[in-house]
UniProtKB/Swiss-Prot annotation:
It comes from Botryotinia fuckeliana (strain B05.10) (Noble rot fungus). Gene3D superfamilies: 3.40.50.1780, Fe-only Hydrogenase (Larger Subunit), Chain L, domain 3. [4Fe-4S] cluster 2 binds at residues 205, 260, 450, 454. This is Cytosolic Fe-S cluster assembly factor NAR1. Residues 416-436 are annotated as: Disordered. It holds the Pfam family Fe_hyd_lg_C. The lineage of its organism: Eukaryota, Fungi, Dikarya, Ascomycota, Pezizomycotina.
């Protein structure tokens, strides 16, 4: 079923109910009474039929299922939510952290009480959504979020144990690391020293990765091995705190605020747990324990009866900040004089800028070269080339946003099916010499599931949400044009983070590319690996696997379906 959907009925959103192959549990029907097969009663005291238990699909079912193409939002909303965050905070007294006498170290209190350390990471796209909603800059939105999660007027004010998040970090920090490592991956692939097949496809979008794993396994060797900024931040937090403070990863609870519901699915991947970086091979503790969206952040405030719009738009006092236990990583995560909150240039887009940085990183290594842009068939398809000063094309790359465009890319990368006839040509080889895929000669492709990129994620605050419609005059509902204008406002808020005149602490390095120093990033990552005693590759890279579902089927049924498909030329 999924193959039919992906080829013919693909849309930018397919709810789980359309293609889910895990059927709702069928309970045995109640046996009719032998005495009264049919009964009509007007007696109001008659017993009501017993309530059936609600049907549920667990996250495990979702991860093991190949029925859905993408967008597991409806299933995951109930599993990772603002209610779960509050439940965790109110479950036990938290571990208390205090500054040491020197002001750079950390002392721990309350280990024996069974509590946890709470850490939050916030994406720039979520800050932009909040900023557009409340008419503030992206930077001010970040301060408001920090006050909500850590400040005295935030969620701790009405909490059972007055627990709050000890650190609120910006995922732009790990985004910069991902940009540098991603660019290095591209260059390594061109030199033949990278195991990922060309073209390398970005893998920071979980909706796209989920789709590839479940319906197009032939593209998995092309996926970038880099972790996403969310995943990399989770690994950095769990490894460093567990090593430095001498506590187990399960006592560090990390929530991420993201623009996308599919990020909940990413956080649940078995490849992103402590079992991977510890190498235990057992079922591990997640690097990111929970993900809430921009919408759910406001629900978090409402649940504590906090008026988000009245939260301070200034930073928390420096005296309230607990230093991260490692001074080098503390400077990396909380830079005092670096443009860490910059979301990149407008040309980089609002999805992190992987492609933009890789192009300029490559161009910086070829003196006199320039980056040229070629617009595609729509706004979400763009081709790029790096051209030498003599006119030679050094590198080709592209941007594909939205599943309709992604489907075209995937189709071009699909290898020809071998013919079953002796001596026959591969099926579809008329335009595929030697039966090879006719994929474009791209070196790198930035792929995102959402049209318009991450600021248009499914978890963002929309123009027709009550908090926005309450401001509109009349009863008219916002239409597509209003949604387009709203997305433009969110994008504008996203790039308002660039309005910083603070100088970079790495400006004295001579290798800056788009304001980021690759040598500084590499030195910091090397320090992280040394501090934790773990191999850097195990910390920053991940893996992918084809998802073949047995959910709702027994082995005999599956074998018969495959046999029939082979007989009729299904090519499964």
């Amino acid at each position: 079923m999924s193959a039919i959907l992906s080829a013919d009925d693909l849309n930018d959103f397919i709810s789980p109910g359309v293609a889910c192959i895990k059927p709702v549990e069928t309970l045995p029907a109640a046996k009719p009474s032998a005495d009264n097969e049919l009964e009509i009663s007007f007696n109001t005291d008659a017993p009501l039929p017993s309530d059936l238990p609600p049907a549920q699909i667990s996250l495990t079912d979702c991860l093991a299922c190949s029925g859905c193409v993408t967008s597991a939002e409806a299933v995951l909303v109930s599993l990772q939510s603002h209610a779960e965050v509050l439940s965790q905070l109110d479950s036990a007294p938290g571990i208390r952290l205090h500054k040491s006498a020197t002001g750079t170290g950390v002392s721990v209190e309350g280990l024996e009480q069974g509590g946890k350390i709470y850490v939050a990471s916030v994406s720039p796209q979520s800050r932009a959504s909040i900023a557009a909603t409340f008419g503030v800059t992206e930077r001010e939105a970040g301060y408001m979020i920090e006050h909500l999660l850590s400040g005295p007027k935030g969620i701790k004010n009405r909490a059972v144990y007055r627990n709050a998040f000890q650190w609120v970090v910006d995922t732009n920090i790990t985004r910069e690391a991902c940009l540098v490592l991603g660019a290095e991956e591209v260059i390594a692939s061109m030199n033949g020293t990278e195991e990922t097949k060309k073209p390398i496809l970005t893998s920071s979008c979980p909706g796209w990765v989920c789709y590839a794993e479940k319906t197009h396994p032939h593209v998995l060797p092309h996926l970038s091995r880099m972790k996403s900024p969310q995943a990399l931040m989770g690994t950095l937090i769990k490894t460093t705190l567990s090593r430095k403070l001498g506590i187990s990863p399960e006592r560090i609870w990390h929530v991420a605020v993201m623009p996308c519901f599919d990020k909940k699915l990413e956080a649940s991947r078995e490849e992103l747990t402590d079992a991977v970086w510890e190498g235990t091979g057992t079922r591990g503790v997640r690097d990111v324990d929970s993900v809430i969206t921009s919408k759910e952040l406001l629900m978090l405030a409402d649940s504590r009866r906090i008026d988000f719009s009245k939260l301070p738009r200034t930073p928390l006092p420096s005296s309230s900040h607990i230093p991260f236990p490692d001074p080098t990583l503390n400077s990396f995560l909380f830079p005092s004089n670096r443009r860490s909150s910059s979301n990149g240039s407008r040309d980089a887009g609002s999805s992190g800028g992987n492609l933009h940085y890789a192009l300029h990183y490559f161009a910086s290594q070829h003196k006199g070269s320039s980056v040229q842009t070629i617009k595609g068939r729509n706004a979400d398809v763009v081709d790029y080339t790096v051209v030498a000063d003599n006119g030679d094309i050094l590198l080709k790359a592209a941007r594909y946003y939205g599943f309709r465009n992604i489907q075209n890319l995937v189709r071009r990368l699909k290898p020809a099916r071998p013919s079953r006839m002796p001596g026959g040509k591969p099926i579809g080889s008329a335009r595929r010499p030697n039966g090879k895929a006719t994929g474009p000669d791209y070196t790198y492709v930035e792929v995102m599931a959402c049209p318009g990129g991450c600021t248009n994620g499914g978890g963002q605050i929309k123009v027709d949400d009550p908090i926005n419609t309450s401001r509109l005059e009349g009863d008219s509902k916002p239409g597509p044009q209003e949604q387009k204008m709203w997305l433009a406002q969110v994008d504008e808020a996203y790039f308002s983070g660039d309005d910083s005149t603070v100088c970079s602490s790495v400006d004295d390095r001579n290798d800056l590319v788009e304001g980021i120093s690759p040598s500084y990033i590499k030195d910091t990552l090397s320090h992280w690996a040394t501090t934790t005693g773990l191999d850097l590759e195990r910390l920053v890279y991940t893996t992918y696997r084809e998802v073949v579902s047995d959910v709702g089927k027994n082995a005999g049924d599956a074998e018969r379906v495959i046999e029939i498909a082979n007989k009729i030329g299904g090519g499964w």
